[in-house]
Amino acid sequence: SAASDVYKRQIYGNSGLGKTHLLLAIGQTIRHNNPSAKIAYVKGEEFVNQMVKSIGTGTAENFRQKYRNADLLLMDDIQFIAGKDSTQEEFFHTFNCLYEAGKQIVVTSDRPPKEMKRLDDRLCTRLEGGLLADVQPPDLETRTAIIRTKAAQFGMILSEDVVKYIAENITCLLYTSDAADDTPCV
């Protein structure tokens, strides 16, 4: 139903636009509002590796429960599971389990589901059935404001010419995703 589709979200866009930062902020907000919430965060590549390891060590059920018992599942860079059939199958069932229980699922990727080559059709349909958020690079005015703000945070005084030059020549401002270390890496 449309009301329950808000439980499924995908944030997509090019690298360096803050998708991971948004994903972590969602997790922090849920944790702040509900300290007992079970939040599972995993990168797509880690999900693949953990699944393979759990099969090899006979702990697949523990792996499943780790994610299926979450109140909120955050998966960063879901595109890394595309083309990995058994991993996609596992994630599909995990997704369904959480969705049917009314739990929240938020994923990030570098492109929308339909553009992910070798993404299982069923999984693509599930992802497209929720809210899709396309993160775009900031415009010139926004980049200028970000540069001024960051310069001030670091105690730097930049002339308007320097701010303008940076804003016009760097269209994507990259920051580390670690909220504790918001150091620019432009």
Task: Please place each PLM-identified region on the residue numbering.
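Conserved catalytic/switch belt of AAA+ P-loop NTPases
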Residues: 89-107, 122-125
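Walker A/P-loop nucleotide-binding motif
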Residues: 8-22
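Conserved AAA+ ATPase "SRH/arginine-finger" region at the nucleotide-binding site
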Residues: 130-141
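Short regulatory helix/loop adjacent to the ATP-binding pocket of P-loop NTPases
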Residues: 113-126
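Short, small-residue-biased leader/transition segments that mark boundaries at the very start
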Residues: 2-7, 179-182, 186
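Short glycine-rich substrate-engagement loop in P-loop NTPases that contacts/grips substrate
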Residues: 40-69
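Short conserved motifs of the RecA-like P-loop NTPase core
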Residues: 157-169
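Conserved AAA+ ATPase "sensor/coupling" helix adjacent to the nucleotide-binding pocket
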Residues: 130, 144-157
